[in-house]
Amino acid sequence: MESSDVLTLISQINQQQTMDLALLGEFIDSVANRNIDINYVEQWLKAVHSNGISVDETTILTKGMMESGSIITWQDNTLVVDKHSTGGVGDKMSLMLAPALAACGVKVPMLAGRGLGHTGGTIDKLESIKGFNCSLNPQQMQDQVEEIGCCIAAQNAAIAPADGLLYAIRDVTSTIDSIPLITASIISKKAAEGLGSLVLDVKCGQGAFMQSFGDAEALAKSMVGAAQGLGIKTIAQITQMDYPIGRYVGNSLEILGSIAVLNGHGSSDTRELVVLQGAALLVLSGTASDEFAGQAMMNNVLDNGEALAKFKQMCLAQGVSQPDVELLITEPTKLLANSKQVTSIESTSQ
């Protein structure tokens, strides 16, 4: 891409004019192929961060980033669903949600990330399970989902490669908190899964990246707009993150908490979020007639062992040995690394 064309885009953003969409497409291709001067990418990111871009431009950016890599295609994506959380302390819903939804009859090709800032990543948590392989390519993801209904895989270079470079540069240019850039980064990868429905869990509070309700609402609206613009049925749930979720914080500890919920017990706040998010996806996909029916389906698979059985299938499919899977379910503390020191802190409130 010619440097003059990038400068044209930057000038249009700075003057709050609509970007030339053809040039924007060329820019995304150049980023994905790594044949653009990094200095120009930095300037473009800073312009977006300072001035913002429209919902339509954000959708075009997201679509271009999605199309920069592999896209999973399904014969019928009506029942293909996923969720994304902006992250928080003790936020481990994906570990239970994917198998529970699969047990309800929908397909969950979940791409997940590693820890960011003070929040733990789903992939880091799964890798605390001995043998669990999160490195699946798009074809492996699709094959596993067709076979057992769900997978949880790490983001990889095949999916939205343009995001890889943009994200790395955002990190060193203090543009991480740009709502259009956050939106494009998240939704481009989710859209590449070939989804029919998506639920966004936008955390708000002291332990969240978006601490004010206004910021959380703005991000939620931006992501919903971009996803719907790409034809994905999408809703956002703004949930509180002033306190940790559940009774465990830490990679292997949150696996313990998740297994407890999959066994039909565990912390009530964790289960409540899993049921809430799962029910919304069941309604969006047409699997449940309304929220009450969706919640009943989710509660049923958590109580009757079907969600736990799907979790075991997922572990086996992704490299965990049969003996270790059985140990993980029955005596997880014998398989997972234990904390070297435990301190109990009693509440002073009644």
Placement of each model-derived feature along the sequence:
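Phosphate/diphosphate-binding glycine-rich loops and adjacent basic-rich segments that engage nucleotide
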Residues: E146-E193
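Active-site-proximal beta-alpha loop/turn segments in soluble metabolic enzymes
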Residues: L45-V48, K125, D163-V172, D201-M210, ...
